[in-house]
């Protein structure tokens, strides 16, 4: 399967004349969604490795030129779910966090807060506790290696039962 050309969305652009270079200012990246942090090139690589065909709209990186019939919450959610279903291992989970930290460091971030719902990855790593342990462990390691302070926010899906959220809140509290 030939991978489509995927632009590097994290490469700094040249600073226009007369403007200050914003890459030199410290930044904080808040409420970064775990799967949403995935590099397009990583998504293509994971899909290729797993033999998964990605929906064409998932690689449409210029939202402004996307046709109106390709937009909307439910279309977005289906595309997001397609990307999330590629994260099926501890190695994939660690890769997402590591790359997000590297990208944020390259952009001048000093703080990153990544939010993840461990139930999405639990089936592949032995449960919600191991899933959260992997996320926290890699966040610590990536923080040490990149210099970006990384916080982890445990998220709960509003589409699931409220008792699931209570379980996740208790799990998060046990790591606080």
Q: Predicted segments — roles?
A:
Residues 2-176:
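Metal-cofactor-binding active-site regions of metalloenzymes
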């Amino acid at each position: 399967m030939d991978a489509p050309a995927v632009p590097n969305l994290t490469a700094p652009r040249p600073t226009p004349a007369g403007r200050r270079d914003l890459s030199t200012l410290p930044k904080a990246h808040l409420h970064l969604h775990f799967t949403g942090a995935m590099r397009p090139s990583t998504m293509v690589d994971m899909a290729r490795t797993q033999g998964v065909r990605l929906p064409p709209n998932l690689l449409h990186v210029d939202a402004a030129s996307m046709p109106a019939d390709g937009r909307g919450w439910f279309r977005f959610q289906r595309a997001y779910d397609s990307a999330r279903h590629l994260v099926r291992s501890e190695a994939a989970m660690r890769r997402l966090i590591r790359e997000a930290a590297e990208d944020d460091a390259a952009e001048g971030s000093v703080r990153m807060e990544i939010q993840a719902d461990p139930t999405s990855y639990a089936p592949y790593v032995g449960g919600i506790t191991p899933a959260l342990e992997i996320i926290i462990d890699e966040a610590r390691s990536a923080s040490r290696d990149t210099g970006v302070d990384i916080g982890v926010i445990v998220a709960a899906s509003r589409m699931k039962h409220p008792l699931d959220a209570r379980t996740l809140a208790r799990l998060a509290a046990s790591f606080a």
